[in-house]
Amino acid sequence: MASPPHQQLLHHHSTEVSCDSSGDSNSVTVRINPRQQQALSAKRCKYSISSSCSSGESGGVGRGGGGGLRRQKKLPQLFERASSRWWDPKFDSTNLEEASMERCFPQTQRRFRYALFYIGSACLLWGIYFGVHMREKQMVFMVPALCFLLVCVAFFAFTFTKAYARRYVWTSGYTLLVFALTLAPQFQPWTLGERQRVQPRPAAPVDTCLSQVGSFSMCVEVLLLLYTVMHLPLYLSLFLGLSYSVLFETSAFRDESCTLLGGGAVYWELLSKAFLHVCIHAIGIHLFIMSEVRSRSTFLKVGQSIMHGKDLEVEKALKERMIHSVMPRIIADDLMKQGDDESENSVKRHSTSSPKNRKKKPSIQKTPIIFRPFKMQQIEQVSILFADIVGFTKMSANKSAHALVGLLNDLFGRFDRLCEDTKCEKISTLGDCYYCVAGCPEPRADHAYCCIEMGLGMIKAIEQFCQEKKEMVNMRVGVHTGTVLCGILGMRRFKFDVWSNDVNLANLMEQLGVAGKVHISEATAKYLDDRYEMEDGKVTERVGQSAVADQLKGLKTYLISGQKVKEPHCSCSQALLQLGGWGWSQMQAAPSAENTADSTKALKHVEKPKPCPSCSTTLVPPCDVSIDEGAIQNGCQDEHKNSTKAPGGHSPKTQNGLLSPPQEEKLSNSQTSLYEMLQEKGRWGGVSLDQSALLPLRFKNIREKTDAHFVDVIKEDSLMKDYFFKPPISKLSLNFLDQDLEMAYRTSYQEEVMRNAPVKTFASATFSSLLDVFLSTTVFLILSVTCFLKHGMVASPPPPAAVVVFVIAILLEVLSLVISVRMVFFLEEVMACTKRLLELISGWLPRHFLGAILVSLPALAVFSHFTSDFETNIHYTMFMCCAILIAIVQYCNFCQLSSWMRSLLATVVGAVLLILLYVSLCPDSSVETLHLDLAQNLSSRKSPCNSSMPADVKRPADLIGQEVILAVFLLLLLVWFLNRSFEVSYRLHYHGDVEADLHRTKIQSMRDQPDSCVRNIIPYHVADELKVSQSYSKNHDSGGVIFASIVNFSEFYEENYEGGKECYRVLNELIGDFDELLSKPHYSSIEKIKTIGATYMAASGLNTSQCQDSNHPHGHLQTLFEFAKEMMRVVDDFNNNMLWFNFKLRIGFNHGPLTAGVIGTTKLLYDIWGDTVNIASRMDTIGVECRIQVSEETYRILSKMGYDFDYRGTVNVKGKGQMKTYLYPKCMDNGIVPHHQLSISPDIRVQVDGSIGRSPTDEIANLVPSVQNSDKTAHATDNSETKDALPSSKKLQKEPTKAEERCRFGKAVEKTDCEEAGTEEVNELTKLNVSKSV
C-alpha cells in the first residue's frame, strides 16, 4: 500500500488515477484533477451514453469545437490501461491484470463448462452416428469419441474444484489438445498405421468413411473453440491454430496427391483450402481480441462504478455535514431529499429513450403550480433567546475590517459551540446581536433550561473573551417562551428562521434587559424551577413609563444572574474549575501534533464525574479548541447521560427529549468547522496541473500503488461477482430487464454518431463496427476469389449470376467500409446532409437491416457459384460445402446486432445448403455423366466403407452421407452459443459504461448540491477563498447597498388564523419574485445578503473580478438601482393580483466603502459592515413609501447616469446628524414631497408586528442612559445572514411569471366568508382577504 503521506491522496483519487492513466509503456500519465472530466460527464443523461464511454487517454489533438474531439487519425488503444503488446491483450499493470482474471473467472468458468458440454455432445452424436451406420472397424471411430466424452465429463467435474481456479488456463489447453489428437486426425482420410508404399502404382489408402465436409467442420469447430473459449494467450492460440491447420491440410494433401487429383490441381486445391483457413483464423482472431477488449473494459468500468459508489458515499456524508452545519438536521434532510428527488426526476426526464420518444408530449398536461414551495410549520412551547453585545460600537470604532471580523469570528465561534453543547439551534446574527431557539424544529421538554444555560454561558464566555482580548464588552440577554413559525422564506440565499409576535417579544426582552444578566419573561419562568437566582425585572423602574415599556402590556419579567449554590463545591464543578484553571491558552500553545495528542490523552484520563442538574456551562473554550462533552455540561442534560465521545473527537448530540440517541457514524476526518469542510472539498478537487505533471517524475510507482488500492477496494465488493455471474438481462431475449436501459442501448450507437463522441478504444461502438465491416469485406473477398479460383480448376466459366453478385456486393462492402471510416475518423468533415444520412442509418432498425445484408454477403456470394458442377464434380461439391461452413461462421461477426437475427440467418444458410445437396439443379444428362466419372474413379478404391457400394453411383448427397447434416447441426449449435455469449458480453460492457457514468453523474450532482448550498450561505467567489484560508474579510471602496422594506406588512399580518402561516406564504411569494429578478444574468453582480422580517437587503460591487471586467467603475451601482426599480414594479404587479390590500415598498440606497466578511465556525454567515451600510439602513427607515431615497453622494453619481430625482431636503439621520437626501421617482410638479408623505421612524409596534431585529427608537435610547444599547437597525444593516439551501431554478423570461399565474388563477376565485374557509390554499388566502384577481 501507499505510504502514509500519500494514503489520503490515493483514497480520494484512486479511481481516476487507476482508471484513466495511459497504457503507454514508455511513459506514465497520471490524472490527479478530474474536475473537468467530471463536469463533462455530469452533462450526460442517465442512460444517454454510448458503449465507448471510456476515460482512457488516447487520441490525437482535435480542432476547436465539439467535433474536434473526433479528429483522431491513428488507431486507438485496445482498451483503457492496455499494454503496448497488441498480440497479448493485457493490462499494463500486473495488479489490474490479476484482479481482472480473478473477477472475470466466473464468466470464464461458465463459458468453459458450456464448451465442455458442447464438445461432449458432439462426441456423443458422432459416436451414435458411427454406431448406427453398419461399417467395418466401427470401434476405430467409436472408441476415440467415447473416450473423449469421458474426458469431457472428467474435466466438467474438475471445474467445480478449487484446483481448477488455479489451473484453468492449462486445463483449457489440455482439453483442446486431447480433442485435436483424438478426433480430428482420426477423421482424416489416412491413418498413421497405413502409409503409402513406394510402388509403381499408388495403393489406395484406408477410407475412414468421413467426408471432407465432416472433417473440415471438425477443424472449424476446433479453431473456433480455441479462439473463443479456451482462454489462452493470443500468440499461443494463433500458434496452435496455425499448427493445427497445417497438420490438417498436410494430411489431406498427402491423400489427395495420391488419388483423385493430379498435377497442379492439387496445389490449386491446397491454395483454395489455405484461403478458407485464413478466413476462419481471421474471424477467430477478431472474436478473440474483441472478447478480451470487452471483458477487460467491462471489468474496469464495473470497478470504476464501485469506486464511484465509494466516492458517492463520502460525498454524501460530506454534503450532509455541510448542510447540517448551517441548519437543523430535520430541515436539512428535507431539503436534501427534495434535491435528490429533483435530481432523480431530472435523470428520468433525460432517460435515453429514442429521440422520437423524447419529443412526444403527454396527452394530459399537468397543471402548473401556482404557489412556490413553502416550508413552514408552527411549533408551540419554544424558548427564544436574543443576546446583544453591549459596547460593541465602541470596541469596533478603532478596529480594522480584518481585526473586527476576527473578533466576531472568535466570539460567535464560542457561541456556536455553546449552542451545540446546550442543544440550542442557532438562527442567525444581526450585527452584534445573536439569537437562537430551543425546542425548535424538534420539540424538547427542557427548552427553557437550554436557553437559560445558553444565556449564562454566553455571559461567562464574553467575560473570558474580555480577559483574553483585553476588551470591555458585556452581554445583554433576553429570553421568552411562546409559539413560533419556523421554516424558510424565499428561493435564493435563504436560511432557516423563526417568526411570530413571541419572537419579537423575546427581542424586546433583550432590549429592556441588563448587561451581565438574563432577562426572562413570566412565560419562561413557568418552565423553570428554583435552581436559579431570580429577581424581579423592574422594567418600569429602570426605563420609566414609555412606549417601549407599554409593549409589555403588564407582563412580569425576571432577571437571572446565575444558579443557586446548594453545596460549596460539587465534583462536577471541581473538574470544570480544574480544567478552567489550566487555561485554554495553554491548550492552544501545544506546538506539535505529539503535544496535542498528549493533551487529548491527558483529558481522557481525567475522571469525568456524573453531571448534576445544578451545573451549568460556566467556561467556554475558544472556537478553535475542542474538548470532551464531559468538560462542559448544562442544566438541561440528564444526569445519567453517557458522555462517551464520538469518533473524531466530537460529542454526540441529542435530538429529541433528554436522552442521547446512538452516536452517528462519522467520517474519520470529520470537522466541525465549515471552513475545514470547504478546505477538505478543495483538497479533494485535486492537485494543480503543474504538480500533477511532476508526480510521474517524482513517484514512478504511484500508478502501481493506486492500482493496488483500486484492487483492494473492489476485492470485497459483491457487485463485481454478481455483475458477471448474474447479468441484468433476460435469459431468453437477452434484452435488459430495465426497459429504459434497453431503449438507451438501442439508441446508443446513434447518439454516439450524433454527438461526435471521441474514439478512444477498440470498445467504441463506431470503431467496433468498423472492424466488423472490415472483417466482413475481407471474408467476402477471400471467399469470392476462392470460388472464382475453383471454377478455373474445374475448367468451367463462372456463372453470370456470380459476377453480378460480386460486383454489387463489392460496391456495398466498399461503401460500408468508407462510411465506417468516415464515422470513426472524419465525421466532423462531412457535409450536413451526409451527416443526417449517417444519423439515419445508424438507428436500431436500419442498422440491423444493413448489418443483415453485410453479414449475409459471403454466403450469398458462395451460393451464387452453385451450378451444375455442384452435382457433376464431387471435389467442387466438397469445396463449396466447406465455403458455406465459413460463411456460417461469419455470422458470429457484428456482435452489436441481435444474436437472434444472426443465428436465425445462419440457420437459414445451413438449411439452404442441405436443400441444395438433396435437390437436383442439373438435367438428367449431367447426372449420367456424373455416374460414369464416379464409377471410373471409385472402382480402383477398396475400402471397408465403399466395398459394398452398389454398381450404380449415387448423388453427391448420397456420397457425402448424413454426416453433413450432423456437421452443419453441430456448427450451427456452436454459432448459436457464441452469438449469445458475445451479445451478453457486449451488453455487459455497455451496462458497465452506464453504471460507471451514472455513478459519476450522481457524484457530480452530490458535489454540485453542497456547492449550491454553500452559494446560498456565502457567495461562490468567497467560498473559493475559504478553501485555502481560515477566514475571509475584504474592504470594498465603492459598494452599493439597498434596504427594501414592506412598510405595511405588520397591518397585513395576523396570528388569529394558523398562527400567521398564510400571511408568510404571501410574503414568501413576494420575496420569491424578488429572488427571480436576481436570477437574470443582467443582475449577476448583485448579491442578496439576507431578509430581516419584511426587509430585503442586497448589495453590489462585492465581487472584484466582475468590477474589473466592467467598463465603468460605478456600473454596478446603475445595475443595483435598476434592480431597485424592478422591485417597485414587482410589488405593483403583485398588488394588482391582491384583493383588499396593497403592499407598499420603501427603499433606501447608498454606496461607499464597506467591509465584507464571513463570521462563525460551525454556521458561516456572510455579512457586510460599515458606515455605508448604516446609512443605507437609515435611508430606508426614514424614507418615503413607494420611493427610493438616496444620499447626496449617491445622487451625484446616479444623476450623471440620467436619473432624475426630487430634492427632499435635510433630514435628521441618527448617528450622522443632518443629511441631504433625494427621492426617486421625480414628482410630476418637481415640488418637494408633502410632509404627510414622510415616514415616521418605526416604533416598537412595527418591530413586534412586522420585522425581527428592529432597533428601539431614539426616544427609548434616551430614556435608558445607563444601558448602552446597540442600534439594532445599524447592526441589521451591518450584518447579513447567508441562507443555506438549494438554489431555485431559473425561469425563462418568455414563461409566465408567478404573478401572472396567480392573476389567471384568481379569476376563478370568489370571495367567501372567513368562517366558511376550508382547508384549500385559495380559501385560506381568501379568509385573510388575500385573493388573486386580474
Swiss-Prot record:
The keyword Cell membrane applies. Binds 2 magnesium ions per subunit. Is also active with manganese (in vitro). It is a multi-pass membrane protein. Residues 57-69 have a biased composition (Gly residues). Residues 1272-1284, 1292-1303 have a biased composition (Basic and acidic residues). CDD domains: CHD. ATP binds at residues 388-393, 430-432, 476, 1090, 1167-1169, 1174-1178, 1214. Insensitive to calcium/calmodulin, forskolin and somatostatin. Stimulated by beta-adrenergic receptor activation. Activity is down-regulated by calcium/calcineurin. It catalyses: ATP = 3',5'-cyclic AMP + diphosphate. The chain crosses the membrane at residues 114-134, 138-158, 168-187, 208-227, 234-250, 270-290, 769-789, 801-821, 850-870, 874-894, 903-923, 958-978. Residues 1-113, 159-167, 228-233, 291-768, 822-849, 895-902, 979-1334 are cytoplasmic. GO terms for molecular function: adenylate cyclase activity; ATP binding; metal ion binding. Keywords: ATP-binding, cAMP biosynthesis, Cell membrane, Glycoprotein, Lyase, Magnesium, Manganese, Membrane, Metal-binding, Nucleotide-binding, Phosphoprotein, Repeat, Transmembrane, Transmembrane helix. Detected in embryonic heart (at protein level). The protein contains two modules with six transmembrane helices each; both are required for catalytic activity. Isolated N-terminal or C-terminal guanylate cyclase domains have no catalytic activity, but when they are brought together, enzyme activity is restored. The active site is at the interface of the two domains. Both contribute substrate-binding residues, but the catalytic metal ions are bound exclusively via the N-terminal guanylate cyclase domain. This is Adenylate cyclase type 9. It comes from Gallus gallus (Chicken).
